[in-house]
From Swiss-Prot:
SUPFAM superfamilies in the record: (Trans)glycosidases, beta-Galactosidase/glucuronidase domain, Galactose-binding domain-like
Record's subcellular location: Cytoplasm
InterPro entries assigned to the protein according to its UniProt record, in alphabetical order: Beta-gal/glucu_dom_sf (IPR036156), Galactose-bd-like_sf (IPR008979), Glyco_hydro_2 (IPR006101), Glyco_hydro_2_AS (IPR023232), Glyco_hydro_2_cat (IPR006103), Glyco_hydro_2_CS (IPR023230), Glyco_hydro_2_Ig-like (IPR006102), Glyco_hydro_2_N (IPR006104)
Motif stretch (N-K motif): 564-566
Swiss-Prot/TrEMBL GO biological process terms: carbohydrate metabolic process; glucuronoside catabolic process
Annotated family: Belongs to the glycosyl hydrolase 2 family.
This protein's UniProt keywords: Cytoplasm, Glycosidase, Hydrolase
Annotated GO MF terms: beta-galactosidase activity; beta-glucuronidase activity; carbohydrate binding
Record's protein name: Beta-glucuronidase
Reactions mediated catalytically: a beta-D-glucuronoside + H2O = D-glucuronate + an alcohol
Cited function: Displays beta-glucuronidase activity with the artificial substrate p-nitrophenyl-beta-D-glucuronide (PNPG). Is probably involved in the metabolism of oligosaccharides containing the 3-O-beta-D-glucopyranosyl-beta-D-glucuronide structure released from bacterial and plant acidic carbohydrates.
Catalytic residue positions: 413, 502
Organism: Paenibacillus borealis
Length: 596
């Protein structure tokens, strides 16, 4: 699916803004067919945004079930006779869409876009109405999974229920990304796939163009950043040779622009689309992660799409601030933990040269013990696996052309120690390699190395571990021994490079004590430093992603003090002591650390 943008032939109408909104706590709206008429008794709701923190109503913040959105729009008369599409960037986690009372789309999965052809139902030159019902319920067939617990005892009101989930971030919901209309002609470009290679001083850009109909002529043109022509081609697939190519490099991004033109049988321009292309290669070789044949060391974070008021709603000001902080702290990468982020953010990563590990929203596939089964007929089952395949396929289809994305992560902290995990993740690994043979794949591990049964299917070992926090809390003197023991065993067992994708400690900004104690800024800084002492001794360690970039919202609980405080920045993006330590460490490290 191509990201909607204005081109020589395409036109965009952004429906972002204030929508009419109504919660449906009794889930009556579908049965009563609220979509057949304008919604009644609504409140204003911004789109894009999570709805949870917009009002002062705790019931809406913690709502379980359907909510309804409505907006009106006018299709320009100039669009008459054209193909009209409605694109929804994100709807967490299930959605049904109606235009003028007619169902045009339904979608499962909260972090990737979907679209609907509304040509037959939208009327140019008059007001039209779009209605979207969004449901936030998580179960074992969603990504991430969850379950509804209904209480049946005298201590709770009849029918009282809660949404349980097994991941550590708040279940924000709503229309998190923009909603857009766009038009094309009846003959249009459906998809573009780009591959790149480097041969000596030349860059090689492979392209494959999928069109709506076989007739029509395809022409492509690659321009450099000065707008000068670098290469041209004809046909729906081919290869462009770029002499003296400028490569896309970490923190030194160079982007070409590919223009694709589709001509009709009369030689007239029917459709045009352009996208940015970064020429680069990615390869895992032994214990080295290579970008353009040069060793790369991951310095950065696990992040979240999370900020005050808007929750997981797209906010370009927050995104730009975050990228400025990444550069300030001398980071070069992040993981889209634990779901696909907005494509607007990936475009920013492309421009800024920030390296990205793209992750599927498969988080919460464990009960954090070695006894309780996850892969059972009534939990993670064949329906779950089918949805996992669908989401993985959609993620690769959306992000395959982003040079910043160098690796796919197929899950976070899954129960990879269970026998049933072997066929489950073998199939997913096969799907990822078939859809994108150019990128390495990984899975982020929770079990210890002698327990994992699936690491052999992946190219890089990614490990999350919280020594002296969840294990042996407060015992900083154990960190180096335990980290070195575990990472060495991962390498000994599987012979693959290792990235520490999560490590850290909660720190409440302004809490201080010396000697360090838990929850102080000093403790967070000291714990990270002791991890780093180990990384610097191990040749097979190729990266360090601190958990987390910034504090973020979670469900309420006795282990969370108004959210997770493991960020080295506060939720308002102010640095803690650990941020300045990391800035110094990563700045002195250069592109690749000298191992001791």
């Amino acid at each position: 699916m191509l990201f909607p943008k204005d081109t020589l032939t395409r036109e965009i109408k952004d429906l972002s803004g204030i929508w009419r909104f109504k919660a449906d706590p009794d889930n009556r709206g579908r049965e009563e067919k609220w979509h057949h008429q304008p919604l009644q008794d609504t409140i204003p709701m911004p789109v894009p945004a999570s709805y949870n923190d917009i009002t002062q109503d705790a019931a809406l913040r913690d709502h379980i079930g359907d909510v309804w959105y409505e907006q009106t729009f006018i299709v320009p008369r100039s669009w008459s006779g054209d193909r009209m599409m409605l694109w929804i960037g994100s709807a967490c986690h299930h959605a049904v869409v109606w235009v003028n009372g007619v169902e045009v789309a339904s979608h499962k999965g909260g972090f990737l876009p979907f679209e609907a052809d509304i040509t037959r139902v939208a009327v140019p030159g008059r007001e039209n109405r779009v209605t979207i019902v969004v449901n936030n319920v998580l179960n074992w067939q969603t990504l991430p999974p969850g379950r509804i617990k209904t209480f049946d005892d005298e201590k709770h009101p009849e029918g009282y229920r809660v949404q349980e989930y097994f991941h550590d971030f708040f279940n924000y919901a709503g229309l998190h990304r923009p909603v857009k209309l766009y038009r094309t002609s009846g003959l249009f470009i459906q998809d573009i796939t780009i591959t790149t290679d480097v041969q000596g001083e030349s860059g090689v850009v492979g392209y494959s163009i999928e069109c709506s109909q076989p007739e029509g002529e395809v022409r492509v043109k690659l321009l450099d950043e000065d707008g000068k022509e670098a290469a041209t081609g004809k046909g729906s697939s081919g290869t462009l040779q770029v002499e003296n190519a400028r490569l896309w490099k970490p923190l030194q991004a160079y982007l070409y622009t590919l223009h694709v033109e589709l001509l009709d049988s009369y030689g007239q321009l029917a459709d045009h689309y352009q996208l940015q292309v970064g020429i680069r290669t990615v390869k895992v070789e032994g214990t080295r992660f290579l970008i353009n044949g040069e060793r790369f060391y991951f310095k950065g974070f696990g992040k979240h799409e999370d900020s005050d008021i808007r929750g997981k709603g797209l906010d370009q000001a927050v995104n730009v601030k975050d990228f400025n902080l990444l550069k300030w702290i001398n980071a070069n990468s992040f993981r889209t933990s634990h779901y696909p982020y907005a494509e607007e953010l990936l475009e920013l990563a492309d421009r800024e040269g920030i390296v990205v590990i793209g992750e599927v929203p498969a988080v919460g596939f464990t009960f954090f013990n070695y006894n309780d089964k996850v892969y059972t007929p009534d939990q993670a089952n064949e329906e779950t696996l089918a949805h996992h395949h669908d989401v993985l396929s959609d993620l690769i289809a959306r992000d395959k052309n982003h040079p910043s994305v160098v690796m796919w992560s197929l899950a976070n902290e899954a129960a990879t120690f269970q026998d049933e995990a072997v066929p489950y993740f073998r199939q997913l690994a096969d799907t990822a390699r078939r859809l994108d043979p150019q990128r390495p794949i990984t899975i982020v591990q929770w079990p210890l190395p002698d327990k994992c049964k699936v690491a052999q299917f992946f190219d890089v070992i990614c490990v999350n571990r919280y020594y002296s926090w969840y294990q042996d809390p407060g015992a900083l003197e154990l960190v180096e021994h335990q980290v070195e023991w575990e990472l060495t065993n991962w390498y000994r067992n599987f012979g693959k490079p290792v990235i520490m994708t999560e490590y850290g400690a909660d720190a409440i900004a302004g809490f201080h004590q010396d000697p360090p104690v838990m929850f102080t800024e000093e403790y967070q800084e000291e714990l990270l430093t002791r991890y780093h002492n180990v990384f610097d001794r191990l040749d097979f360690v190729i990266g360090e992603h601190v958990w987390a970039f910034a504090d973020f919202a979670t469900k309420q609980g006795i282990t969370r003090i108004n959210g997770n405080k493991k960020g080295v920045f506060t939720r308002q993006r102010q640095p803690k002591a650990a941020a300045r330590m990391l800035r110094s460490r990563w700045g002195e490290m250069g592109e690749y650390p000298e191992k001791l």
